[in-house]
Design a protein with these regions (language model features):
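Glycine-rich phosphate/pyrophosphate-binding beta-alpha loops
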Residues: 293-302, 404-407, 417-430, 488-495
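Noncatalytic scaffold domains of N-terminal-nucleophile
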Residues: 29-63, 67, 75-76, 80-239, ...
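Active-site rim segments in enzyme catalytic domains, especially the processed small/beta chain
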Residues: 88-95, 101-105, 109-112, 263-268, ...
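Short, small/polar residue-rich loop motifs at catalytic or cofactor-binding pockets
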Residues: 279, 400-403, 468-470
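Bacterial N-terminal signal peptides that target proteins for export
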Residues: 1-14
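Internal maturation/activation junctions in enzymes
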Residues: 314-421, 431, 442, 574
Length: 584
């Protein structure tokens, strides 16, 4: 049965909860997943609210957003507050030293903002090749300034606030300023990740901030203050985003990147000054009676999610319910989607991405016809999408890791789905004097430049944005009204996490908490991956009889989902992480 907390019980008496259809959870709640290392599960209750809601990766961040909404702020206002607090309390995942994608619904229009990091002007395709011409080892590339892309999060937050904000800019920054000055308690998750971290102590500023004099991670509950970050935020509050991209903060970023002792980068002040956020059309596609909308290239996430759903559209997923048959179809659909993603998707300023063709219902029906209900296809080949002529590219080997996600709905029905990142856990493992970690986003590019005699679409190029798997998603119902806001961190696994959750919400009609906590499953066009330590392990034998190469792996999703009902809002925060879904 679903565990319901005090808030739920108090609302039952008001007749609120009775109108919300719920399904019992299908699975146990065991141990958790990667690319950020797993730190265990925490039992969660379904979030319930009547006016507005925030689902985010840390209770302090969610509470900051909730308070902004209670003060009359918009979903965009709340997103600024949530992101800046996350920079403090979940520094391993996101922050102003990184980038983000935002999908915004204003009740009539869907807009996306691309705050993805960019390669410096000096970057070359061979950036991550060693002296022998072979790709560098991943962490040899990650640690240091070489992997740092020009951050986009601050520009994105300012752009969203200018376009959709209601409260003053200073007011939405204030919760993070107060927390940075007065301190916050180190959470078990942050402490656990610091304990597993191998490289962060090599940076003097990070070592002094996160570790004690003996080199041990500061203990759970230790109050951590960040006066340097507080000053950075006050500067941004007074002068806006320009103060990040020019002046002292910009110089601090450049110095930190270029002065790394063993792996310096080549970012310049001009790289920062020239950064712009791109407003792009949302990618929307049908699934059952719903419209699924999200971010287009340079993100591959929404294209791949819609490819998976387009294949599943041909099947009665509702009658399957969670089990080996559903996993077979979701995994085979994932193989097809990842095959296309690896070949076609990159920064649209550099590559003609055939978005219309890849998401065309006819094309997806033809891809679905390749699925044998009784046998896995193994490794799928890319398709040939219609409508757009595209250059022949080589497949990409880009590696992708962790992030954070927030879902927000305000009392006017506006919604934010925002996935935000510094890429790997703790990014490039370098901290600025301004109080924040820098990203290692450039390792999201392919390390190789040519495959099969063809240039790789996602290779490094000057000013280019690396391909992403982030899939912030907003779902509209058949009447074009807001129905759900969904997203997750998790590197390339994000695509499967979001697809699984959408099937749980839309086909199996699960409560968002239950949908988030479903075992993670799928394929990235390699093995069929089942989440270790969950009920999914029992499906391994049945899948192997269909020819699946099954791997049991940790899958550390951080799904945050909100569903709109006639009576209000219900939300879920993945039990694998420490987030919450709360509202007013």
């Amino acid at each position: 049965m679903i565990v319901r907390g005090p808030l739920w019980r108090s609302l039952v008496g008001l007749g609120f909860a009775a109108s919300i259809p719920l399904a019992a959870p299908a699975f146990a709640q065991p141990v958790a997943p990667s690319p950020e290392a797993p730190t265990g599960r925490t039992a969660k209750t379904t979030g319930v609210a009547t006016k507005d809601m925030v689902a985010a990766a840390n209770p302090l961040a969610a509470q900051a957003g909730r308070e902004i909404l209670a003060a009359g702020g918009s979903a965009a206002d709340a997103a600024v507050a949530v992101q800046l607090v996350l920079n403090l309390v979940e520094p391993q995942s996101s922050g102003i030293g990184g980038g983000a994608f935002m999908v915004f619904w204003d009740g009539t229009a869907m807009t996306t903002l691309d705050g993805r990091e960019k390669a410096p002007a000096a970057a070359k395709p061979e950036r991550f090749l060693g002296s022998d011409g072979k790709p560098m080892k991943f962490y040899d590339a990650v640690v240091g300034g070489r992997s740092v892309g020009v951050p986009g999060t601050v520009r994105l937050l300012e752009a969203a606030h200018k376009k959709w904000g209601k409260l003053p800019w200073k007011q939405v920054i204030e919760p993070a300023v107060n927390l940075a000055e007065n301190g916050f308690a180190i959470s078990p998750r942050l402490n656990g990740l610091l304990s597993q971290e191998k490289y962060l102590q090599n940076d003097p500023l990070a070592r002094a901030y996160f570790y004690d004099a003996e080199g041990k991670p500061k203990a759970v509950g230790t109050v951590l203050k960040n006066p340097a970050f507080a000053q950075t935020l006050r500067t941004l509050a007074d002068k806006g985003a320009d103060a990040f991209y020019t002046g002292e903060i910009a110089q601090d970023i450049v110095t930190t990147v270029t002065s790394h002792a063993t792996n310096p980068g080549d970012m310049t002040l001009d790289d920062l000054k020239s950064y712009v956020v791109e407003e792009r059309p949302a990618i929307c596609g049908p699934y059952r009676v719903y419209k699924i909308c999200g971010m287009g290239p340079p993100s591959s996430g929404q294209i791949a999610v819609q490819e998976i759903l387009g294949v599943l559209e041909t099947q009665d997923m509702a009658s399957m319910k969670p089990g080996p048959e559903a996993v077979h179809w979701i995994s085979e659909a994932g193989r097809l989607a990842f095959a296309d993603r690896g070949l076609y998707v990159a920064d649209p300023a550099f590559v003609n991405v055939p978005v219309k063709g890849l998401t065309d219902p006819g094309y997806l029906k033809s891809r679905a016809a390749l699925v044998d209900p009784n046998k896995s296809m193994g490794k799928a080949k890319p398709g040939e999408p219609p409508f757009q002529k595209t250059f022949l590219w080589g497949p990409s080997d880009g590696i992708e890791y962790g992030t954070s996600h927030m879902s927000i709905v305000d009392r006017n029905g506006n919604a934010v789905s925002m996935t935000t990142t510094i890429e790997d856990g703790f990014g490039a493992r370098i901290m600025t004097k301004s109080g924040f970690l820098l990203n290692n986003e450039l390792t999201d590019f392919s390390f190789t430049t040519v495959e099969d005699g063809k240039p790789v679409a996602n290779r490094v190029e000057p000013g280019k944005r690396p391909r992403s798997s982030m899939a912030p998603t907003i779902v509209l119902d058949g009447g074009n009204k807001l129905y759900a806001v969904v997203g997750s961190p998790g590197g390339s696994l994000i695509i499967n996490y979001v697809a699984k959750t959408l099937v749980g919400l839309l086909d199996w009609k699960l409560d968002p908490q239950v949908a988030a906590d479903l075992p993670n499953i799928g394929s990235r066009n390699g093995p069929t991956e089942l989440e270790a330590g969950t009920e999914a392990e029992a499906w391994k034998a049945a899948l192997e009889t269909k020819g699946h190469d099954v791997k049991l792996i940790d899958q550390n999703s951080g799904i945050h989902a909100i569903v709109v009902t006639p009576a209000g809002l219900i939300g879920g925060a993945d039990s694998r992480r420490e987030g919450v879904a709360i509202g007013n």
